[in-house]
């Protein structure tokens, strides 16, 4: 039986999702619980492997089990054993050929930034502090250039190991908030550090150090050295996982060009 789990977590005190030899991770927390319940190792498979310090409002993983436990009991058992910075929102049974990673057709991230005269220690780990006044209109102009299908080689970590760096973004915009602004970006998939590089560049645009019209040339150049910035992990939230094309159509309309994954290229 294949079990699908919807979770949220506050990532400040985790070394990321993926299990590490030493240190606290999301995968380690769940596999420890599942091993105790099954009396043997159980591997979980996430929709996204978030990095150290990154949060998730919505994240999914699946695992296989021989235990005959109702969905609500799975949720209750895991929440009872989990620490306070992780929560299981929902548990459901899925077909045995469903795969959390390869059936995922889209992801949405939100990067939160606050602006004030002084740093707020109570927001440490939850939002990124930018003291300068920024030109939100110019940032939005630049953000729009990222929408569509592009090679994002120049906007990801040089450690990115996947062969194809072509991704499709359905949404890329700045949203003003009471304390600052958020960057919302939705796409078929994202490269290593891609969202953090995108927002770091947009902040430079907001400061007047870069221009919106540079984006097409930078995408064409595919040179990471021309965009040598990466924003901190603390402001980044995995906000939504799209597991079906209908979910994307509901949010972005019938004309959206949906990329079916079923491969390791669109991480």
Swiss-Prot record:
Gene: truA
Catalysis performed (reactions): uridine(38/39/40) in tRNA = pseudouridine(38/39/40) in tRNA
Disulphide connectivity of cysteines: none
This protein's UniProt keywords: Isomerase, tRNA processing
Name of the protein in its database record: tRNA pseudouridine synthase A
Top-tier EC class: isomerase
GO terms of molecular function: RNA binding; tRNA pseudouridine(38-40) synthase activity
NCBIfam families reported for this sequence: hisT_truA
SUPFAM superfamilies according to UniProt: Pseudouridine synthase
CDD domains: PseudoU_synth_EcTruA
Family membership noted in the UniProt record: Belongs to the tRNA pseudouridine synthase TruA family.
Self-association state and partner proteins as the record states: Homodimer.
EC numbers: 5.4.99.12
Source species: Staphylococcus saprophyticus subsp. saprophyticus (strain ATCC 15305 / DSM 20229 / NCIMB 8711 / NCTC 7292 / S-41)
